[in-house]
From Swiss-Prot:
It catalyses: guanosine(1207) in 16S rRNA + S-adenosyl-L-methionine = N(2)-methylguanosine(1207) in 16S rRNA + S-adenosyl-L-homocysteine + H(+). GO terms for molecular function: 16S rRNA (guanine(1207)-N(2))-methyltransferase activity; nucleic acid binding. GO terms for cellular component: cytoplasm. Keywords: Cytoplasm, Methyltransferase, rRNA processing, S-adenosyl-L-methionine, Transferase. It is found in: Cytoplasm. Pfam families: MTS (PF05175), MTS_N (PF08468). It comes from Citrobacter koseri (strain ATCC BAA-895 / CDC 4225-83 / SGSC4696). This is Ribosomal RNA small subunit methyltransferase C. Its main location: cytoplasm. Monomer.
Amino acid sequence: MSAFTPASEVLLRHSDDFEQSRILFAGDLQDDLPARFESAASRVHTQQFHHWQLLSQLMGEKARFSLVAHADDVADCDTLIYYWPKNKPEAQFQLMNILSLLPLGTDIFVVGENRSGVRSAEQMLADYAPLNKIDSARRCGLYHGRLEKQPVFDAEKYWGEYRINDLTIKTLPGVFSRDGLDVGSQLLLSTLTPHTKGKVLDVGCGAGVLSAALASHSPKVRLTLCDVSAPAVEASRATLAANGVEGEVFASNVFSDVKGRFDMIISNPPFHDGIQTSLDAAQTLIHGAVRHLNSGGELRIVANAFLPYPKVLDETFGFHEVIAQTGRFKVYRTVMTRQAKK
């Protein structure tokens, strides 16, 4: 994370203006600029565990990870620099949360790539911190305003839910498949047979759909779920609770905080980090699975058919098989054997 994103490069064009500022950085933080930016003081609040991992190493307690920011997360800040995400409801949740905590008169800066929809910030903040565009470069926009009115923020109002057969799925802004079951997960679910037993790890659990569905026909399964996203972790906990399913749910950057071995690892791994394309998580998942599968344990993932996962599976496990496919997606299966590269 040493190279700066285009959004950060636009901010650096104005770095002299921030030397006396006490800044809170938030939003879609994709680099370590908050730790390297010259200012009177800098803090970070992020909902992404992998971003917190990096920034906390550089900033210590000044970097915070949670679903909702609290007053002590923004203490003494007189400036907000918000990186616009690709997901508008996610931006709404985060900005309303943070603006409800900051004092009137706080300088508000919003920066993001044009393709992320950063222009939407003007309308979203019109009643609270009217924005003006102050720079346009690197296919990004930078907006500035001052906080004139604090919004009232109630996290409970952002919860949503939908049903899959007899299951209730709880969701929050920023969670994958927030509005319904995605086609890839649906294909993976179709391959999970009833009466599965043993310990199952759901990596990148999102709203907890895969685990809740698996538990509905395999009640003896022991579930562990993890995700880098704070909204996903909370949504998965709520989904399990809504369906009377037990399981451990926690934040982890793929396997970073996972302990022990499992009989099955299931995942619909992301190939986007924010608006950037990234295969890192899936490759880390495949390579790392050998250290978290019992002998004879199985890795089962769904992915877009065009992604180069067969090669990585073969290099790591020695083989793979495709057990279901559509025109767009494939479900890959491989098994932990002696030939797997530990």
